[in-house]
């Protein structure tokens, strides 16, 4: 065969491959991230029919009762879950729920992928095979051959038990056992890069290749897999690409915080990627107040062009044409712990709608998709549409200024001062670090601002945020729509945001004045008294909003987070810090 013809054939093959890659349908997935250890979230997004109607191609099922916890391991050892035992009955009931979830998804015409923490194994299995699967520290280890053998058996039984399951979403690092009482587990990544490679190759062989099922391997882990380009490539370059193996990556370099960089691992390497986006922002109200983030996710947040200039990409729009772009995965509901709890998921629906519809057709602009949302939700009049658009864009500006800063340096650790339903104070934490206390971070920030003569300016920014929320409340009163419940919730949730950020502004003001007093020995008691009264009135109005409006979300609490159920807080936090200075104003001792 002439060399020129051979060259032409190779060129044709590459062209066809490129065309195939360009015409692949993107994954448009959704997940409800149920709170571990709590009743399942009541939401439309649990319904596969609803997901299908909204254009999703698949459901990530994450109730933390994992599909691989719903198998018996009888082939390995029938004593792991003996016949007639309560443990086996639990497994049987869990398996029936998995089957029902698979049937429901397929009946609706979408695929289903089970969220899977690895390592999670039966407690009895670990006790029986402890010496063969555990390391010197008592942790289950993938460095032990028996552990790998058991996981091969586990995957075999998993897909034999649930042959219609479309695939798995794999998480390492965090291991949630709250909903699996007869199982135990730990992080499998004990040897860095090589642990990931060993696990991914196992999953690729057993799931993608042998069974033609899909693996979404989440990079969310410890040690750099998620946020280090070098680490990510060190792992993925050792893995042969497979059409059923997709890497799943949050759009942020770290967790879903506004001041975090765009993820540098996106687009690099030789594997398909799907991008995770949180809609019910766990560190920013969870849908209790307006917080529209998809303009920032798709086009780039304002801070990426101001206080946090990006070295590389800064938005999904910039990477949508990458050969590795495989779709989007919305976390429509959930993330984090406890509240605030919402009964109206309007703001979650808005974020989920825009990211999923844009992901289906990335040639659309974010604003075009946003306009379609208004069409679908009965926001018809020009004045209402203008007010709603302005409100949503303003909410993104208000949130970063209220929770972090849009003007000044804000360290990546300080963002944890507020999370879930909690407001931290300026004390140093008094519980073990393993409980992930949120107290202590704000004191670090205040110290840095004080030393750099910026504390007053930062506090002024918080006071200015209240004016933005006043504008949002005004705009909410201009929005008319077909659904009266949603129209009412826009108004109530906007007032919620205004009052919460008033509490934050006045709480920060009190703590800042007190902080300066602690440093100098001189407390401006007159000003402290003024802001203490404002702070108390803020809380009174905030509580009245909830009492008078059934649709209002549950309220924030002036405590710092600690990872102890069921309350997830102790006594430290904003309330304790404010009360310290109240006593000083009253003339009492600290």
Labelled PLM ranges:
Residues 23-254, 258-259, 284-286, 332-360, ...:
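Aromatic-lined carbohydrate-binding surfaces of glycoside hydrolases
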Residues 141-144, 189-193, 302-306, 359-363, ...:
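Hydrophobic alpha-helical scaffolding
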Residues 246-336, 444-463:
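Active-site core of glycosidic bond-cleaving carbohydrate-active enzymes
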Residues 566-590:
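Terminal, non-catalytic domain-edge segments
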Residues 1-5:
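Positively charged n-region of N-terminal signal peptides that target proteins for export
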Residues 46, 96, 100, 153, ...:
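Generic recognition of stable, solvent-exposed alpha-helical segments in well-folded globular domains
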Residues 6-18:
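Bacterial N-terminal signal peptides
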Residues 321-564:
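C-terminal non-catalytic alpha-helical accessory regions
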């Amino acid at each position: 065969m002439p060399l020129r013809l051979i060259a032409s054939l190779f060129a044709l093959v590459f062209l066809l491959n490129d065309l195939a890659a360009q015409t692949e349908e993107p994954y448009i997935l959704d997940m409800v991230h149920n709170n571990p250890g709590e009743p399942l979230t009541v939401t439309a997004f649990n319904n596969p029919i609803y997901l299908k109607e909204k254009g999703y191609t698949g459901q990530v099922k994450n109730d933390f009762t994992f599909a691989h916890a719903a198998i018996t391991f009888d082939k390995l050892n029938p004593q792991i879950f003996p016949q007639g035992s309560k443990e086996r009955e639990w497994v049987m009931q869990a398996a029936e729920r998995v089957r029902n979830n698979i049937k429901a998804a397929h009946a609706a015409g979408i695929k289903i992928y089970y969220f899977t923490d690895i390592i999670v194994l039966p407690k009895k299995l670990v006790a029986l095979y402890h010496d063969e699967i555990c390391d010197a520290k008592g942790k289950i280890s993938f460095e032990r051959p028996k552990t790998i053998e058991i996981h091969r058996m586990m995957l075999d039984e998993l897909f034999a038990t649930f042959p219609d399951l479309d695939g798995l979403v794999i998480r390492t690092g965090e291991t949630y056992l709250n909903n699996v009482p007869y199982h135990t587990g730990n992080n499998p990544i004990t040897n860095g890069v090589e642990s990931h490679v060993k696990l991914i190759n196992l999953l690729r062989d057993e799931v993608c290749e042998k069974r033609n099922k899909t693996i979404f391997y989440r990079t969310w882990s410890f040690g750099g897999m998620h946020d280090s380009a070098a680490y990510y490539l060190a792992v993925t370059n050792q893995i042969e690409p497979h059409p059923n193996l997709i890497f799943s990556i949050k759009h942020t370099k770290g967790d879903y915080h506004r001041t975090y960089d765009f993820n540098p691992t996106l687009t690099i390497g030789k594997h398909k990627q799907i991008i995770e986006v949180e809609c019910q922002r766990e560190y920013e109200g969870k849908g209790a107040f307006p917080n529209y983030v998809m303009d920032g996710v798709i086009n780039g947040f304002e801070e990426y062009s101001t206080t946090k200039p990006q070295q590389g990409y800064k938005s999904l729009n910039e990477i949508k044409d990458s050969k590795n772009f495989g779709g989007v995965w919305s976390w429509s509901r959930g993330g984090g712990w406890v509240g605030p709890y919402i009964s109206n998921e309007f703001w979650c629906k808005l974020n989920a709608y825009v990211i999923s519809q844009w992901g289906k057709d990335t040639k659309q602009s974010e604003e075009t998709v946003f306009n379609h949302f208004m069409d679908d939700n009965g926001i018809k009049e020009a004045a209402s549409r203008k007010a709603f658009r302005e409100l949503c864009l303003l909410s993104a500006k208000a949130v970063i200024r209220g929770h972090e800063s849009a003007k000044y340096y804000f360290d990546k650790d300080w963002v944890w001062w507020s999370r879930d339903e909690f407001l931290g104070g300026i004390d140093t934490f008094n519980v073990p670090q393993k409980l992930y206390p949120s107290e202590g971070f704000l004191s670090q920030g205040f110290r840095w601002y004080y030393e750099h003569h910026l504390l007053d300016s930062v506090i002024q920014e918080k006071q200015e945020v209240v004016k933005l929320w006043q504008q949002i409340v005004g705009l909410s009163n201009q929005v008319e729509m077909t659904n009266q419940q949603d129209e009412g919730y826009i108004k109530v949730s906007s007032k919620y945001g205004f009052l919460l950020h008033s509490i934050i502004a006045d709480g920060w003001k009190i703590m800042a004045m007190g902080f300066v007093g602690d440093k100098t020995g001189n407390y401006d008691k007159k000003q402290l008294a003024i802001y203490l009264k404002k702070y108390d009135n803020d809380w009174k109005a905030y509580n009245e909003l909830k009492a008078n409006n059934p649709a209002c979300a549950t309220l924030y609490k002036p405590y710092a987070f600690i990872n102890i159920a069921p309350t997830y807080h102790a006594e430290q936090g904003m309330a304790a810090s404010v009360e310290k200075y109240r006593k000083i104003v009253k003339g009492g001792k600290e």
